[in-house]
Amino acid sequence: MSNFLHLKYNEKSVSVTKALTVRFLTKRFIGEYASNFESIYKKHLCLERKQLNLEIYDPCSQTQKAKFSLTSELHWADGFVIVYDISDRSSFAFAKALIYRIREPQTSHCKRAVESAVFLVGNKRDLCHVREVGWEEGQKLALENRCQFCELSAAEQSLEVEMMFIRIIKDILINFKLKEKRRPSGSKSMAKLINNVFGKRRKSV
């Protein structure tokens, strides 16, 4: 049985996120990407004896796309990879706003059984000499908002990029298991409630 896993990327610094995606899919690094169109990448993989179909949605960087409403994505995305550039503080501020939006108290129209998996990634670790965002800041933001966190360099660290994706996919699989566990327990509780109500009626008759 195959599972579909959907990941949503940060809507800013699109060349950075596309670099991570291409690293994961092909193990190659390409520095420049067109950022005026959105992309959906698909990959089939086997993990923990499960056949998985992974879909990665990478949005365009047009200003109108950067309002991070995320309403539709909160419905279908199983996980979010929020990427910022450690040498650009404004990208970190935008990543923070996106995480706050994802972790807002859930409204009725986008209520989920479990929280979405979120991975905060500080990219361009190879540019530490011009760093504007400290490692501690990223770690603190992740801990406060129940996210995983790492710093890496898409340009230099193919293995680290792959491991980051594997970690969030594992988080998503754990969430799938939690959903499955909650469904039967809810059914059992309802069956017990119905049995109690009708059982009492039978006794009274």
Swiss-Prot record:
Amino-acid positions noted as binding GTP in the UniProt annotation, renumbered to this chain: 11-18, 58-64, 123-126
Family annotation (InterPro entries): P-loop_NTPase, Ras-related_GTPase, Small_GTPase
Catalysed reaction, written as an equation: GTP + H2O = GDP + phosphate + H(+)
Region feature (Small GTPase-like): 1-205
Database matches in PANTHER family: RAS-LIKE FAMILY MEMBER 11 (PTHR45704)
Family listed: Belongs to the small GTPase superfamily. Ras family.
Protein's name according to its UniProt entry: Ras-related and estrogen-regulated growth inhibitor-like protein
Name of the gene encoding the protein in the UniProt record: RERGL
